[in-house]
Amino acid sequence: MAEARFAVRPTAALHHVGFEVDTSRKQTQLYVSRRGLVLYVPHPYFIIKNMRRSFWHGVDKVQFALYPIPLSVVTAFSFGVFLWVLNSPADAWIRVNCVSDILWRLDERNFISSRIPSRYRMPALCANVAFGAVTLFTALQRFVLRKLLSYNRWIYEGQGKLTRKTMLWGFILKTFFMHNLKRTGAYGSCLPSQPLPDLKITVQRFMKSMVPFYEEKTAEWEHLKKLSEDFLRNEGPQLQRYLWLKYLLADNYMTDWWIKYVYLAQRESLCINSNWFGVAFAKYLPTPLQASRAAALVYNLIKVKKSLDRRTFPPQFSGLVPLDMNQYRYVFNTTRIPGREMDVLAQHEGIKHIVVIHKGRFYQLEVLHPLTNHQLTPYQLEMALESILHSEDETDPVEALIPAFTTAPRAEWADIRDKHFVNNAYNVKPLRVIEEAIFVLCLDEMEPKSLEEESMMYLCGNGHNRWCDKSFNVIVTEGGHCGVHAEHSWGDALTLANVAEYSHASDEFKELYTEDGHVKKLPEDEVALAEGKFKVFVPNRIRFTTDAVMKRAVQGAQERCIREIKDVDIRVCRFADYGKGFPKKQRCSPDAWVQMAMQLAYFRDQGHFDQTYEAASMRMYRKGRTETIRTVSEESCAFVRAMEQPSLSAEAKLKLLRVACERHQKTSRDAIAGCGIDRHLFGLYCASTGFEVASEFLQAAMQSKWKLSTSQVLTRQLPAKFHPPNDEPFETPNGGFGPVQDDGYGVCYCLYGENLFYFTITSKHSCNSTSSTRLAEHIKKALRDMAALTGWN
């Protein structure tokens, strides 16, 4: 994905932000300017609202600090101690002992306690001590849990092959620590930090991974080898010490640099180059009515948002191990604001609207009741969306193109935003409405005829109907198909896919639809209709002012985007001969099997090997993002070459395939266990840039180009009870992303069920050496050839 495009050429851009009052934040602000000290105090309504929010945030922090014991239990225990001591005789042992004497002397220095009546002073002191003791006990529990979660040998042990040590670890974890906590992020403080690998081992693994690309380049290999040896002798240990210091001080030694320099510092267009798309279903359609489908989606997404706001969204697990939930903070109300040197992720709280884009018009649609904050019903939303679809409002041809600005290079968009929007009294408020929205809903005017057309709609639209800066856009076609267009810096695809799965699971059961395809009326709708109190919140039209200068700029942005769109070669490949159940029977990892098929297909397509990127999730660690799985290995190359030798027997080729799959699985497990190569090298490179420590080896390592970038997004992350027993009608290709290199491929693959594979392949028409259709055919042939080694036909 985008990380593969940019991770090899990070920039040490620094973003300088001045201090100024932002009245849109509705918070008390104090800053020093040339005019002196400036104090901004918002309306009392917002002060009370902020105080209430701060109070509940404080309660959450105390709750997490006391994990795994609920705050109510700790409070009740402390109050029980207070009553016990209060009703105890003056000569009771709880009042008269050496410990109480020491505590009493210490408490005499507490000026607050001196104001408490003497009768209640000792009980209050004991209650405070009890609360403190429980807090220390829970802190010890979290410390032990964090140490337990640092154990990673289970990653290398398959089912049925667990050692006694791992089984004991699992028993202790499940019995004493893994309570059924429903609070979002409840386990966050217990997660271990992402491990910092050993410097020498990382360099050795990097050199081993590069062997296949230097087989006929002896001189270049010797030069790289010398650079690595010099690095380990000279600047390497110094840079490792810098990283070690950051590892000790930060929640995650990598994540902040990763977000800054891989995403926010990059100056290229987001559309195609960074943003990605998702497809809900390949064939299934719960309703053909656009407004109904959109209303149900919005309703379900707002349900998820409210559960995240209340911290009741259930934590995710990988087996017994909890996953980091930090990315979920950025799913809603998040916008990437362009900057000259570096972008900024902006979040907005207390927002109750989404923005709808239809036929070049923009609407502000309330999804929460402005007074009660209750969620609007699907029926209310459908009525509001119907009014948009049937609106006869005029469309300003220049205004309609404004979203094309978000597809422009970031520095260019930053200048345009400042000139025509931020510093324009008429346009600053409409822009703020869009950027503060919960998300953007795009009601497209066309219906795709194929999965390729649908994928292109979600990836980039027509060049001016996606707000690429938003955390995500929900797209609903004229015939009721839907997908998402998502910005990448705030989080990874698995996070948004999990949120979307909650919404789509409801669609699978058709919970919100009537037989004629409209959304159902909820009981509160029926009551309101019967009493004549039913209300539809009419969407507000968002209007911008335009001039000749803006017209030229936006037309230029759109024309450039259209050229880039036309250059994208996309192919969605459905392979139904067999699925992941077949590799399992061959004692091979399904992911490794598919990766070897893509290696064979790429070799047949290009005639040589190139570096291949596969993303691995690092959410087992606090604030973890991803790590690179380097697919190409000496074992994978040996298998691919063997497949091209007719003289070799099927048994010999199958043996090499299994060895290659085992090697890939070992590499994947190393990455997940925090022993990857690329994030460590990237951190060393950032340290060398920041501290101005020159390193030829790191410069050479960062020049790598990932010609084949691959990614798998899990289709099902929710428990089976959330889906119908038969999942065949709900198959999906999941989504995809643009090619990482102009002369390379981007491949997003989906292992759906036990009997189906999907591949979404992208490349550039302008590159004569690539063809998405050709690679798709090579992948299908490779999968069949590999299966034939086992006697399959």
Regions found by a protein language model. Give the residues of each.
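Long, Pro/Ser/Thr-rich low-complexity/intrinsically disordered regulatory tracts in eukaryotic proteins
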Residues: 2-470, 479-480, 487, 491-793
